[in-house]
């Protein structure tokens, strides 16, 4: 189990509900924090949820999060604007796992219009089960990414 709860924020209400159901049933030992988005408000926009999740990560409320929008791309772009967030769209388990192991990915974004519930759940499980390798080459690259973030903001 991870030290902090996982967060789930999204606009894809049906996919979110299925993820919560399946991830809860998987018995991973994670606590999930719902940061909103049930599809009932037409003024909901993915940047708002991305910022909310990014701040929860930045502030140490959660360790990782999952964002859902139509394609996953917009949510990823918005989340990556928050210092300390490393978000990526992953629609396959290899990328979801490897993103954590090599790049210390802390936000998985999914596209509700692109991926079905079964592969989305498999990606989420791979993302949550993975840990950063800490290998020298991955640390070196991560430190370079963090330096870019510090210099550019």
Feature locations, PLM:
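Short, structured active-site "lid" loops
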Residues: 46-67, 71
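C-terminal binding/interaction regions
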Residues: 7, 11-14, 92-153
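A short beta-strand-loop structural module common to alpha/beta enzyme folds
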Residues: 30-42
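Short Gly/Thr/Asp-enriched flexible loops that form oxyanion-binding sites at enzyme active sites
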Residues: 74-85
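Short hydrophobic/aromatic-enriched beta-strand-loop microsegments
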Residues: 85-92
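N-terminal beta1-alpha1 ligand-phosphate binding loop
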Residues: 1-23
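Short helix-loop-beta junction
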Residues: 21-31
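Short, high-confidence coil segments that cap the C-terminus of an alpha-helix
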Residues: 29, 61-63, 104
């Amino acid at each position: 189990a991870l030290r902090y709860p996982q967060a789930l924020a999204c606009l894809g209400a049906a996919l979110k509900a299925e993820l919560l159901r399946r991830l809860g049933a998987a018995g991973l030992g994670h606590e999930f924090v719902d940061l909103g988005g049930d599809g009932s408000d037409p003024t909901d926009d993915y940047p708002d949820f991305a910022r909310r999740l990014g701040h929860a990560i930045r502030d140490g409320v959660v360790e990782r999060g999952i964002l859902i929008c139509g394609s996953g791309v917009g949510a990823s772009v918005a989340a990556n604007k928050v210092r300390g967030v490393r978000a990526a769209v992953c629609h396959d388990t290899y990328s979801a796992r490897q993103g954590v192991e090599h790049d210390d990915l802390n936000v998985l974004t999914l596209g509700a219009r692109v991926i079905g519930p079964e592969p989305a759940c498999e990606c989420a499980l791979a993302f949550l089960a993975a840990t950063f390798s800490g290998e020298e080459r991955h640390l070196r690259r991560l430190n370079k990414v963090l330096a870019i973030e510090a210099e550019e903001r």
